[in-house]
């Protein structure tokens, strides 16, 4: 188990839009991560666009800034503090990116990363395209595909140093959706909550079926969210994933790998 990352940052009172960049900077500094100096301003503009677009389409359940500061932006960026996890100029795919988390904040904070945002809904990608253009992010590409289909596509299969996901799927499911995208020597990175412990053994068995090695867990403490149990689990890619994985769309969720007595 790794070192607990992050530390508290004071102040939870409501803030005006003009104060967003300062609050973001304070939060980023509390994480003790390296980030591009323009990151706070760009994340503030990202949040403004998210708030506007969310009025006409369901991108996220809550656009309150104080909630989003911890649960979206700092949560997305906290793993940058894990030594060696995000190498310089790494290629990264965010699978099932939704409103862009965690991939777009990572691309904003680390312009050296080559980032692909993949999602199955075109309307979400339309929003992300608008944000990427507004922020001038030349290190971001968009892909319209389901994870299972993308993981079998030779354009994307085993093409990335990192595959990340912040969804609510169980660890064995995330292993099957992410590891096919990862080069041998790279890692899948899963953002997980309290369920991580109970999913650990099945996740490890699933990872081995997919060419993965021993799972690595790092607890995370987010500024202002000290009561939120959170961790990052890295799945190293040791061998190529056999051709049968990922299985067809929907199957990983219905029949997760790594279950006792299962596949």
Residue ranges and their predicted role:
Residues 124-126, 196, 200:
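Short alpha-helix immediately C-terminal to the canonical SAM-binding loop
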Residues 203-263:
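SAM/dcSAM-binding transferase cores
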Residues 37, 144-146, 216-218:
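Short loop/edge segments at beta-strand edges and connector loops
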Residues 2-89, 93, 123-140, 248-249:
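Class I SAM-dependent transferase core
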Residues 148, 193-197, 222:
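Short "lid" loop at the C-terminus of a central beta-strand within the Rossmann-like core
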Residues 74-169, 175-176:
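Conserved SAM/SAH cofactor-binding pocket of Class I
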């Amino acid at each position: 188990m790794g070192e607990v990352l992050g530390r508290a940052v004071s102040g939870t009172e409501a803030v005006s839009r003009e104060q967003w960049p300062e609050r973001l900077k304070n939060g980023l500094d509390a994480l003790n991560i390296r980030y591009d100096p323009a990151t706070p301003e760009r994340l503030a503009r990202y949040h403004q666009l998210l708030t506007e677009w969310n009025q006409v389409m369901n991108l996220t359940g809550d656009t309150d800034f104080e909630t989003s500061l911890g649960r979206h932006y700092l949560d997305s960026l906290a793993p940058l503090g894990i030594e060696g996890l995000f190498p310089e100029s790494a290629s990264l795919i965010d699978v099932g990116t939704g409103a862009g988390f965690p991939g777009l904040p990572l691309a904003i904070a680390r312009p050296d990363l080559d980032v692909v945002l993949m999602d199955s809904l075109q309307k979400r990608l339309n929003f992300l395209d608008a944000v990427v253009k507004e922020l001038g992010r030349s290190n971001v590409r968009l892909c319209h595909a389901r994870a299972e289909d993308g993981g079998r596509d030779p354009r994307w299969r085993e093409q990335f140093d990192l595959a990340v996901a912040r969804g609510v799927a169980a660890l064995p499911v995330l292993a099957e959706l992410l590891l096919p995208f990862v080069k041998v020597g790279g890692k899948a990175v899963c953002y997980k909550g309290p369920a991580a412990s109970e999913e650990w053994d099945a996740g490890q068995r699933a990872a081995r079926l997919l060419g993965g090695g021993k799972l690595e867990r790092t607890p995370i403490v987010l500024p202002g969210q000290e009561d939120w149990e959170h961790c990052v689990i890295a799945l190293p890619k040791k061998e190529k994933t056999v051709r049968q994985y990922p299985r067809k769309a929907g199957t990983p969720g219905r029949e997760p790998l790594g279950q006792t007595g299962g596949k």
